[in-house]
């Protein structure tokens, strides 16, 4: 069993709330208008912007949603409150998909005390210069600090650079729930059924992947807590089998491959480099190797990057173009190195008609990367594959086997 999660079907959630526990309710929204999350990540199944309410002697609302959905979210909040007023608005993360509805919320509920980190309040002032939160309506959450609601106690855990500087997570002790900010999130709206891991990996590697050391620090803090449920700001509520999710985050944040396999990423203008990549992929597949092939000019680059982190071996088949790398290959490698790609075996296939330089340039781009082991087999194609190149590809397949 890969996962156990609470998903929210539109028929169950539209205009109403969902119960997480007797006293904790989901009041988030689904976004099927967005095509590119953060202006770059394809999200064919939309996005979820999650928000929660803790009902007790005092009421805490956990985070807001994207501003385009402020009114829908406020309706959800109002239904759960059932005539009561919120005492606290806890802001764990100031990225606009979670904070942009703060002004609308405070206009509706002006007596609410806002709880955030000191840096969170700084960012609030930057994002929303039009609102002024009085000092008595601000509560700066200390690292390790608590907030008593009645039978529920919120414990604040700073999580800087996971993936913004102001981020904190919140542990609710009585229900044993970790409100994890963007941690353990995924792409996709909650009214679309899909496995967690692939879109969570693509989300993590793309958005959080650079900050492995910071995630490791948070995981060490989490290990001291009795966590029975994880409530992220994106994706489903996670429960049961939490070891699966924690193990994935440990792998991803320590830059260790999840499994053995080969990603072959190629850039080809006239199809000759593509033929070499396909030839190698066929050889590897027939030998029993898990092999994934990406045309970098046409694929979802975020998926190609995520798979490079998933598997333990990477083949880059590139061409020389204007005395440099073909642009999509350069962009792909930059996407890897800026996310601290490491602990992998890498092979290079270059193609050039008169002055092939791709191999040298590719290797140079990994100079500062940790524990990148290049294969012994080096392949240079002059325009199109010949018999010698096929023999070299056979040798490379054996070396990668």
Where are these regions (language model features)?
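Active-site metal-binding motif and surrounding structural segment of the metallo-beta-lactamase
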Residues: 68-115
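Metal-dependent phosphodiesterase/nuclease catalytic metal-binding core
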Residues: 19, 53, 169-231, 239-266
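Short, charged N-terminal beta->alpha structural module
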Residues: 265-287
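Active-site neighborhood of phospho(di)ester-bond hydrolases with catalytic His/Asp-centered motifs
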Residues: 62-64, 86-94, 114-117, 178-182, ...
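FMN-binding flavodoxin-like domain, especially the glycine-rich phosphate-binding loop
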Residues: 190-230, 234-237, 257, 279-292, ...
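Metallo-beta-lactamase
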Residues: 19-22, 116-167, 211-217
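Conserved beta-strand hairpin/beta-sheet module of binuclear metal-dependent hydrolase folds
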Residues: 17-78, 169-172, 176-180, 273
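Short, Lys/Arg-enriched N-terminal segments with co-localized hydrophobic residues
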Residues: 2-17
